Amino acid sequence: MRTHFCGLINETLIGHTVTLAGWTDVARNLGGVCFIDLRDHEGIVQITVDSRAIDQNNSELFKVASGLSYEDVLQVEGVVCARHAVNDKIKTGKVEVIATKIKILNKAAPLPFHAHENPGEDIRLKYRYLDLRRPEMQRMQRTRIKLVQALRRHLDMHGFQDIETPILTKATPEGARDFLVPARMHPGEFYALPQSPQLFKQILMVAGFDRYYQIARCFRDEALRADRQLEFTQLDMEFAFVSERDVQDFVEEMIRRVFKEVAGIELDTTFPRMTWKEAMRRFGSDKPDLRINLELIDVAALVADSTFTPFTDAVAHPNGRVAALRIPSGTVLSRKQIDEYAAYTAKYGATGLAYAKLAPTGEITSPIAKFFSEDAFASLLSHIGAEKGDIVFFGAGNYNKVSDFMSALRLKAGKDFALITADWRPLWVTDFPMFEWDEEAQRYVALHHPFTAPAAIDDIDELRAHARTALSRGYDMVLNGNEIGGGSIRIHRPEMQRAVFELLGITEDEARAKFGFLLDALNYGAPPHGGIAFGIDRIAALIAGTESIRDVIPFPKTTGAQCLMTDAPSPISEEQLSEIHVITKKTTP
């Protein structure tokens, strides 16, 4: 049906007859000469039809060409010629194809939007097949394809085995809500779609496969946002007989190689490492964006003698924090803008945002200065490193809450003051706490997941005694403020796994019911093992330069968890419900 791709026609083909197929990108009738931009997945080439040529066939061709609409599907035969008016904006801009035959393969209906427009997201998702024709969307999908291909090549080359794990599996508490599938042959029972292949890949290590990977589809019934979908894709990996450093060194090399191969991006030869505690102290986040040269500074010791109640209450609380953030040249902020910053941090839990301005003259303006002696306040600002022209923001309260809203403020200030450098800053975050205490549930929860091994603790009694301060063997890879991969060394001894379940409030009977197959497998000579999973959607979005992972997923869901193209989810018939033994209950709004 075609001999060449549109976007690959070049000077080497001048004088040759070619057959092309594609879509009408633009058709222009310029007084007897028709120019058609014919587009396929490789690009655009200009097709020319001149009605003035003394040829009956050309007259018919011109009639066809002048009646074309956007996105009509064509087959064109013609001769490649040098183009008189070179177009340097496209790679075929030095040539054109003088048409000898044009066949309309399919007419397109009037379009809801054109391929070169950028309409609202809802209409793009409704007509996703048209949206995906746009050159920018084609570029982003190709980025994703190249990324997956490069990852597979690297892993295949290093002896990893691509092994599929079940999609219909057992419901287990891994954090988010499961998607459940009724089991028709077992009335009242349900499968769950996997949130990750975590347990299966561990069992593959017990089974002796040594190095596993999978481009895995995962499902989590959770609230959506720009970087989260109900169904997503991850590169899942597991290694037997490895330490944390073994895993990190291998995947570091892989990510460096893949970024260079896919996008020409050069990453650091060695990724820096930072403990979770240091990341929270300096940046208020366990996924810090190192491109922003702003850090939080703890000032509890310097504000303890003030009479400002929010500060003194935080200092007195064992879980309190008082942190400062200096923004260079920040005195340009008006009172209205400062109030907007306060409102912004309130979304992240702040109950107030104190500040101090240092005018270029050296004058200090601050609503909290009156709660300090003049020397004490000057000493505080000096400790923070504040200079003339700077503004300093202060956050006080619960440690985690202060970290959250001051981290959000740091990111916003970085954008607003153009402090984000145009480079790539990867790092490893390590030494996560093994557990977090859930005040509401009055029990421990796993910071990573229940299968992560504790660090430097082999004795069960010691783990029980030091659960609140125990560290895990977990690690995250962070790039420009995005967690792109997370992993850990796993628990491989059944008695340690039981002890962790116990600390998490999972009873022996519940552990047996939900994880009995894992506990049994660990009894039969499970090797030490560990692994990591990378978010394909997120990495593809970073490389492609988009803030939304929806742009690199061919058919994403909206933030309302719908597919606008297919109208999923949709009701099903009573007959279908009866077959799967399900009765639905309507809820009143």
From Swiss-Prot:
GO terms for biological process: aspartyl-tRNA aminoacylation. It catalyses: tRNA(Asp) + L-aspartate + ATP = L-aspartyl-tRNA(Asp) + AMP + diphosphate. Its EC number is 6.1.1.12. Pfam families: GAD (PF02938), tRNA-synt_2 (PF00152), tRNA_anti-codon (PF01336). L-aspartate binds at residues 174, 220, 448, 490. PANTHER family: ASPARTATE--TRNA LIGASE, MITOCHONDRIAL (PTHR22594:SF5), ASPARTYL/LYSYL-TRNA SYNTHETASE (PTHR22594). This is Aspartate--tRNA ligase. The lineage of its organism: Bacteria, Pseudomonadati, Pseudomonadota, Gammaproteobacteria, Lysobacterales.
